[in-house]
Amino acid sequence: MQNKLASGARLGRQALLFPLCLVLYEFSTYIGADMIQPGMLAVVEQYQAGIDWVPTSMTAYLAGGMFLQWLLGPLSDRIGRRPVMLAGVVWFIITCLAILLAQNIEQFTLLRFLQGISLCFIGAVGYAAIQESFEEAVCIKITALMANVALIAPLLGPLVGAAWIHVLPWEGMFVLFAALAAISFFGLQRAMPETATRIGEKLSLKELGRDYKLVLKNGRFVAGALALGFVSLPLLAWIAQSPIIIITGEQLSSYEYGLLQVPIFGALIAGNLLLARLTSRRTVRSLIIMGGWPIMIGLLVAAAATVISSHAYLWMTAGLSIYAFGIGLANAGLVRLTLFASDMSKGTVSAAMGMLQMLIFTVGIEISKHAWLNGGNGQFNLFNLVNGILWLSLMVIFLKDKQMGNSHEG
């Protein structure tokens, strides 16, 4: 590709500054979802709203993450990745500060939706630029290592959020998110390369519809994108629902709630670290299959334990930790293969992939909320297991071609 930035041998400080600044922005948007969740109990109390608004905050945030993906990817193909990405960072800073003016839970939730739009820029623009900037082996390593930094958000978020809410108002969290994003803005402005290949082409809705139609007619791409959504949903549902499950349902403290996040997200990081070590020695296909075993075993353990005893939250945590390790091992390779399953420009493909995933997350978190409200931990984890089974079925379709991901070139 003519816009390749560097090979592994040429990866210098300037080249690395771009992914580091991108992951700082990603971190600020992710911690915007995770750190506020333990604080949501204080938010709903302040606005005199019911606890069912707690997971709805994340639902609104993820719905925002789906809202403009269809436009931003193709737009960045034509006017450039840099200006679109930088505009997204500025939008996040503004909406984080605007939430300080919210007067009720409805306004708060609307602003969470507007903040969530910032997620669109990561997948549709930022990660497309990463994929276009580095060769495959280097790219997968960077993606995995970037994921480790980004995953500190759900690891630290609940711990810091639970502690923060005891000493500082929840509004201060959003000032922190805006400050982190501001730092990433200056770094991206300095280091982000321009990798778009269709700059100057006219953007027409007719052509845009045609492009998406071609992408969505690709059965292998759709299977991969849906699989990524279903396999990640149990983790997102846990982040959204765990304050209610642990603090309200199990009557544990916010400190204990924070500690229960550590094994799950620690396992996720461990899976990513193992992936980074194995990438140059194993095929992408074998890494996905390897990760599939802990994914299914972990979800099965969590479901079986909580169906037998609804309050077996330690077994649930253990099962979700095993599952998270598998996610860390399998997902980066699956993202790569899915993105390149279509020959369409990567901005459009990445946007389509992100929209399908966000649709699954938005609907799925609401379903998981009602599953827990109606059937407790057992139904919540059975729902997670169903998502694992859907992922497994889609993987059979996606990897049906024995050559798919069966070389170190993907």
Curated annotation (Swiss-Prot):
<dbReference type="InterPro" id="IPR036259">
    <property type="entry name" value="MFS_trans_sf"/>
</dbReference>
<feature type="topological domain" description="Cytoplasmic">
    <location>
        <begin position="277"/>
        <end position="287"/>
    </location>
</feature>
<protein>
    <recommendedName>
        <fullName>Multidrug transporter MdfA</fullName>
    </recommendedName>
</protein>
<feature type="transmembrane region" description="Helical">
    <location>
        <begin position="53"/>
        <end position="73"/>
    </location>
</feature>
<feature type="topological domain" description="Periplasmic">
    <location>
        <begin position="248"/>
        <end position="255"/>
    </location>
</feature>
<feature type="topological domain" description="Periplasmic">
    <location>
        <begin position="309"/>
        <end position="314"/>
    </location>
</feature>
<feature type="topological domain" description="Periplasmic">
    <location>
        <begin position="368"/>
        <end position="378"/>
    </location>
</feature>
<feature type="transmembrane region" description="Helical">
    <location>
        <begin position="83"/>
        <end position="103"/>
    </location>
</feature>
<keyword id="KW-1003">Cell membrane</keyword>
<feature type="topological domain" description="Periplasmic">
    <location>
        <begin position="37"/>
        <end position="52"/>
    </location>
</feature>
<feature type="topological domain" description="Cytoplasmic">
    <location>
        <begin position="1"/>
        <end position="15"/>
    </location>
</feature>
<feature type="transmembrane region" description="Helical">
    <location>
        <begin position="347"/>
        <end position="367"/>
    </location>
</feature>
<feature type="transmembrane region" description="Helical">
    <location>
        <begin position="145"/>
        <end position="165"/>
    </location>
</feature>
<comment type="subunit">
    <text>Monomer.</text>
</comment>
<dbReference type="InterPro" id="IPR005829">
    <property type="entry name" value="Sugar_transporter_CS"/>
</dbReference>
<dbReference type="InterPro" id="IPR020846">
    <property type="entry name" value="MFS_dom"/>
</dbReference>
<feature type="transmembrane region" description="Helical">
    <location>
        <begin position="227"/>
        <end position="247"/>
    </location>
</feature>
<keyword id="KW-1133">Transmembrane helix</keyword>
<keyword id="KW-0813">Transport</keyword>
<keyword id="KW-0812">Transmembrane</keyword>
<keyword id="KW-0472">Membrane</keyword>
<feature type="transmembrane region" description="Helical">
    <location>
        <begin position="16"/>
        <end position="36"/>
    </location>
</feature>
<feature type="transmembrane region" description="Helical">
    <location>
        <begin position="315"/>
        <end position="335"/>
    </location>
</feature>
<feature type="topological domain" description="Periplasmic">
    <location>
        <position position="166"/>
    </location>
</feature>
<feature type="topological domain" description="Periplasmic">
    <location>
        <begin position="104"/>
        <end position="109"/>
    </location>
</feature>
<feature type="topological domain" description="Cytoplasmic">
    <location>
        <begin position="188"/>
        <end position="226"/>
    </location>
</feature>
<dbReference type="Pfam" id="PF07690">
    <property type="entry name" value="MFS_1"/>
</dbReference>
<dbReference type="InterPro" id="IPR011701">
    <property type="entry name" value="MFS"/>
</dbReference>
<keyword id="KW-0046">Antibiotic resistance</keyword>
<feature type="topological domain" description="Cytoplasmic">
    <location>
        <begin position="131"/>
        <end position="144"/>
    </location>
</feature>
<comment type="similarity">
    <text>Belongs to the major facilitator superfamily. MdfA family.</text>
</comment>
<feature type="transmembrane region" description="Helical">
    <location>
        <begin position="379"/>
        <end position="399"/>
    </location>
</feature>
<comment type="function">
    <text>Efflux pump driven by the proton motive force. Confers resistance to a broad spectrum of chemically unrelated drugs.</text>
</comment>
<dbReference type="GO" id="GO:0005886">
    <property type="term" value="C:plasma membrane"/>
</dbReference>
<feature type="transmembrane region" description="Helical">
    <location>
        <begin position="256"/>
        <end position="276"/>
    </location>
</feature>
<dbReference type="GO" id="GO:0046677">
    <property type="term" value="P:response to antibiotic"/>
</dbReference>
<feature type="topological domain" description="Cytoplasmic">
    <location>
        <begin position="74"/>
        <end position="82"/>
    </location>
</feature>
<feature type="transmembrane region" description="Helical">
    <location>
        <begin position="288"/>
        <end position="308"/>
    </location>
</feature>
<dbReference type="GO" id="GO:0015385">
    <property type="term" value="F:sodium:proton antiporter activity"/>
</dbReference>
<keyword id="KW-0997">Cell inner membrane</keyword>
<dbReference type="GO" id="GO:1990961">
    <property type="term" value="P:xenobiotic detoxification by transmembrane export across the plasma membrane"/>
</dbReference>
<feature type="transmembrane region" description="Helical">
    <location>
        <begin position="167"/>
        <end position="187"/>
    </location>
</feature>
